[in-house]
Amino acid sequence: MIEIITEADYKDRLAAMQNGVLLFFKKLCPHCKNMEKVLEKFGAAKPGIALYGIDIEENAAAAAALGAERPPTIFVIKGGEAKASKVGLMNPREMAAFFEKA
């Protein structure tokens, strides 16, 4: 399940995250909704990976700090750092490959 975080706690969450995914989304974005479903499937297949989401409109400073310009933007977090990012929709197989490659 994707846990929603905010600007107030995203830095602490990222710093503590060993393996995870951060999704910048917009509430009315259809591609974001689809990407949420992909991440839910991805998370079910890889239970040790943390899944976080952050609203890009309500948390613009966090988006700017990480370089997320438009939703959906996905960041792979390993060892507390963003190792890779991608904008747009992926299927579960692409998401798994993207995570492993980062």
Residue ranges and their predicted role:
Residues 29-32, 74:
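The canonical Cys-X-X-Cys-His
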Residues 1-12:
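N-terminal "domain-start" segment that seeds a small globular fold
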Residues 15-27:
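Short active-site neighborhood of thiol/selenol oxidoreductases, capturing the structured segment around
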Residues 66-75:
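Structural micro-motif
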Residues 12-13, 62-66, 98:
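CheY-like receiver
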Residues 4-6, 24, 43, 47-61:
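Thiol-based oxidoreductase modules, predominantly thioredoxin-like and allied folds used
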Residues 75-102:
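Non-catalytic, surface beta->alpha helical segment in thiol-disulfide oxidoreductase systems
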Residues 33-45:
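Typically the conserved alpha-helix immediately C-terminal to a functionally engaged Cys/Sec
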